[in-house]
């Protein structure tokens, strides 16, 4: 497998599902075999993952399953082999793992959280942050997430809902000062705003099966 990473955010509503879906679609269009995963028992976002990756999204849950089982699931659906389903026999090129809620939100403090999955699988984290109402205050937010659990690895930050080129420049300076790579700045766009229903986003108008 060429690449595997986890997409997380400080809170729900930061844009991680929309970003994850976009990256999955991009990698798939480029000809990569993309294996999607969802942290926790979420049954809505996995449907959206499958729509763009053309293969089932697998749930990873350290509350419902042991750490050993989570590692085995990840291995089976990324590395392939005879013990994998027919559609997963060939190794994946890219694995994208997404989580609902915030990075450290679990059933008991951080246990069962996205951070727990990142720790168990030793995956680098891309942090998606809603930057619509902050500039230099982002330094404190980024420091807090990076320093809170030193065992985690952060590949970088993607700022969402950025207001202007000047705002983006300020946010890039913040990332450089904190010591984390700025992987991108997504401008605030009405077209990217998704409604929500039940436990997840509502993409019904964009899917063919609804």
For the regions a protein language model found, what residue spans apply to each?
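ATP-dependent carboxylate-amine ligase catalytic core
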Residues: 2-14, 18, 24-121, 129-152, ...
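Short hydrophobic alpha-helical runs that function as membrane-insertion/retention elements
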Residues: 125-128, 183-185
């Amino acid at each position: 497998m060429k690449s595997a990473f986890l997409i997380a955010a400080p809170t729900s509503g930061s844009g991680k599902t929309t970003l994850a879906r976009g990256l999955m679609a991009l990698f798939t269009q480029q000809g990569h075999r993309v294996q999607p995963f969802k942290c926790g028992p979420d049954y809505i976002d996995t449907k959206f993952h499958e729509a763009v990756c053309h293969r089932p999204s697998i749930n990873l849950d350290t509350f419902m399953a042991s750490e050993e089982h989570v590692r085995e699931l990840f291995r089976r659906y990324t590395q392939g082999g005879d013990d994998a389903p027919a559609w997963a026999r060939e190794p994946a090129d890219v694995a994208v793992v997404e989580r609902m809620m915030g990075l450290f939100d679990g059933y008991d403090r951080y246990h069962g959280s996205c951070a727990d999955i990142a720790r168990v699988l030793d995956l680098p984290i891309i942090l998606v942050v809603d930057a619509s109402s902050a500039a230099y205050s982002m330094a404190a937010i980024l420091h807090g997430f990076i320093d809170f659990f030193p065992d985690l690895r952060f590949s970088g930050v993607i700022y969402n809902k950025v207001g202007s080129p000047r705002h983006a420049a300020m946010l890039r300076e913040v990332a450089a000062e904190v010591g984390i790579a700025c992987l991108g700045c997504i401008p605030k766009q009405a077209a990217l705003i998704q409604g929500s229903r039940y436990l997840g986003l509502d993409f019904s108008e964009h899917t063919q099966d609804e």
